[in-house]
């Protein structure tokens, strides 16, 4: 079984995991591809289900930022639904998946801890850029996929 996790944020990413083990980790940065390219990539991965982070507008964000965020969410939801032939796209709030994977910190430290947990669970995953900086969209997408894969296996 293959499960997809999507972080729809501005620096978002898509991750597909295979239930056969942590060796298969496919990652795609959303900010670097067109929606069509993202669909083609996801279609080739053949996910059985898709989990998208259920996020909403944030207080203090500008109207322009909120609009862009909503637009990204709509695009990835459509891509996901088409890639899994119209099946239901599942959602999970950050609070739920972060608790599930063992995040214990708050605020800006969350991104670092999520990456540390992801590296332990999936050491083959490339979560860092060419200069060594964390690509937090990848880490989030990976942990959303991890959450989804474990939920699917229990059903």
Task: Outline where the language-model segments fall.
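Phosphate- and other anionic-substrate recognition elements at nucleic-acid/protein interfaces
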Residues: 1-155
């Amino acid at each position: 079984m293959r499960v997809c996790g999507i972080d729809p944020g501005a620096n978002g990413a898509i991750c597909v995991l295979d239930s056969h083990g942590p060796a298969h980790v496919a990652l795609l940065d959303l900010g670097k591809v067109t929606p069509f390219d993202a669909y083609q990539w996801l279609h080739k991965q053949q996910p059985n289900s898709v989990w998208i982070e259920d996020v909403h507008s944030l207080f203090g964000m500008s109207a322009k930022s909120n609009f862009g965020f909503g637009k990204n969410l709509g695009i990835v939801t459509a891509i996901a639904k088409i890639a899994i032939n119209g099946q239901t796209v599942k959602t999970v709030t950050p609070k739920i998946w972060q608790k599930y994977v063992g995040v214990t910190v708050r605020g800006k430290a969350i991104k670092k801890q999520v990456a540390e947990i992801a590296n332990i669970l999936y050491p083959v995953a490339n979560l860092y850029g060419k200069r060594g900086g964390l690509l937090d969209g990848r880490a989030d997408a990976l942990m959303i996929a991890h959450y989804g894969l474990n939920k699917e296996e229990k059903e």
